[in-house]
Amino acid sequence: MTSIDWRSALTDDEQGSIRDIVAAATRHDGVAPVGDQVLRELPADRTRHLVAVDPDAGAVVGYLNLAPASDTAPPMAELVVHPDFRRRGTGAAMARAGLAEGGTHARIWAHGNLEAARATARTLGLQVVRELLQMRRPLTDLPPVTVADGVRLATYSGPGDDPELLRINNSAFAWHPEQGGWTDADIAERRAEAWFDPAGLFMAFDDASGKLLGFHWTKVHGPDLGEVYVVGVDPAAQGRGLGATLTLTGLHHLAERLSNSPQPTVMLYVEADNGAAVKTYRRLGFDVSSVDAAYAAVAD
């Protein structure tokens, strides 16, 4: 019988096994079962770790990460079970344990909202409380970039830019459960990632004052796929077309980075209920490719 136990910290071997499970599930499902932040948390002790071990296989076969509540987000769980060990009730048992540990307001992500996740949600009496759209478009036939008078574009020059990046990010995303409330450590962690490229972090400055107005952080996932990772604009600078300028600047950069691909593609994530942003991205040629759903217990 599979054992399921909480850990405050993971061993190196457990971390390696979990990364392997995530990779296997991604290949099997066509969508990553957990977000990048979960992988960053594996060696840390900021979150809780629920590990499922199959005694016959002598191996980790499932993992749930439980992030504590923050000022902008409730407790959030993310879950993966190895494809070879599914349909045994492990996923449902882990989801039930994670939500119980997280408390009344806890939520659990279903990346791609696949049928298996929907079935588990029905079994546990959960309902969708939030949806995140993944949108994509080809990196071909891009509109030209237009830069307004008085705006200067540059790329990230190093940690000296971080205070202004944090100011813009935390004002633009004060409402956002994951993106809001960043600290220096959040930028430093991402700067240490293998994918980080300072030439792909674009910044728009006001020529007169020198103040940062907005930024677009791009990400390359592989030879065929790039991402609009974050676009943030100072709320005080809204209405100047900066979002479109920064987005298109990043798209042209990604198109150049992926120029050897026969089908270069860019993706982004946007809240399903952010109608204005969805409309803007549709105008730029993006279409919905998948939906991530956050589930929570139905209130009595």
Swiss-Prot record:
1D-myo-inositol 2-(L-cysteinylamino)-2-deoxy-alpha-D-glucopyranoside binds at D36, E178, K219, E227, Y269. Its EC number is 2.3.1.189. Acetyl-CoA 1 binds at L79, V80, V81. It comes from Mycobacterium sp. (strain KMS). GO terms for biological process: mycothiol biosynthetic process. It comes from the Bacteria. Monomer. It catalyses: 1D-myo-inositol 2-(L-cysteinylamino)-2-deoxy-alpha-D-glucopyranoside + acetyl-CoA = mycothiol + CoA + H(+). Acetyl-CoA 2 binds at V231, G232, V233, N274, G275, A276, A277, V278, K279. The gene is mshD. InterPro entries: Acyl_CoA_acyltransferase, GNAT_dom, MshD_Acetyltransferase, Mycothiol_AcTrfase. Keywords: Acyltransferase, Repeat, Transferase. Belongs to the acetyltransferase family. MshD subfamily. This is Mycothiol acetyltransferase.
